[in-house]
Amino acid sequence: MSGTGAQAIGLDVGGTKTAAIRVTVEGVVLARETLPTPANDMQATLDTMVQVSRSVITPEVRAIGIGAAGLVEKDTGRLTFAPNLAWRNAPLAQHLWDSLGLPTIADNDANAAAWGEFKLGAATGCRHVLFVGAGTGIGGAIIADGRLMRGAHGFAGEVGHIIVDPDGPLCGCGNHGCWEQFASGHAITRAGREAARQHPQSMIARRCGGDPAQVTGPLVTESARAGDPVARGILAAVGRSLGEGLGGLANVLDPEIVVVGGGAAAAGNLLLGPARASFVVAIEAAAHRPPVPLVTASLGNDAGAIGAAMMALEKLT
């Protein structure tokens, strides 16, 4: 559809915000809007998706694509389960199609982000890609020989819920000790709150006003950037867990490239430096095989929305 003037809206629906962008078929962002996600109210979230889409829609828009965290049925666009949100069986695609009258598709947010990076970002030109979005939790997507690997039921890529410690923290999926509890924003926040309790003189404790419940992942990251050794230690530990898991996945999948998106990328080398070091150690016989680059998503926070928009336009052809 290149050169046709066709445009699409891409939505990235997360636990805290719902972002919409309008893009050309070449991936050029023309407009954007973001609204808070009413995460505990499914109907309010569906209505927010309509509202944020209307704010960027024009007559040139031919389709809408949605990327949402959780298990999404690709054929129906229904979100069946979201471990970090109070949603079950949400008719994402159908609600927007009915409300706006435009063909709408929905997919897992990591699949959408991976597709964006594959088509227009850090993985352009690669055929075998492992994408991991490490934000509040961890989502994953696998591109094999240029195609998204979806599995028998369309739910492939839920790497954040690999159990690494059965006695570990309770996860939103209902299990204990999932990888995302050690290598994502969950881990940073949990460790930051514990540090605020155990180290009352730390920058983390001062920045939260002495109330550990006020500690967030960004607060820990900001403290680390300001030189706080406790915060830096937290990011390093989470980074090592991230890299170890990525190395294990690379052993299974043998990708050309590993792309990391989400809040982990925003933390920069304070987290990704330790991640890269443990990633190399975790790869089997790393000295005897081609190196696997571990890079950050070049589309940044737009990766999921751009990828969803590209998916929607491709569905029209």
In which residue ranges do the predicted regions lie?
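A charged helix-plus-loop insertion that forms the helical arch/lid used to bind
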Residues: 78-88
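Short loop/edge segments at beta-strand edges and connector loops
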Residues: 106-108
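Adenylate-forming
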Residues: 113-119, 140-142, 161-162
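ATP-binding/phosphotransfer module of carbohydrate and carboxylate kinases, centering on a glycine-rich
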Residues: 1-63, 73-78, 93-104, 119-126, ...
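Short, charged low-complexity linear segments at domain edges
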Residues: 142-158
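Short hydrophobic alpha-helix segments
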Residues: 33-35, 83, 152
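A short acidic/small-residue loop/turn micro-motif
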Residues: 36-38, 87, 156-158
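Short beta-strand segments
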Residues: 12, 65-69, 130-137, 141-143
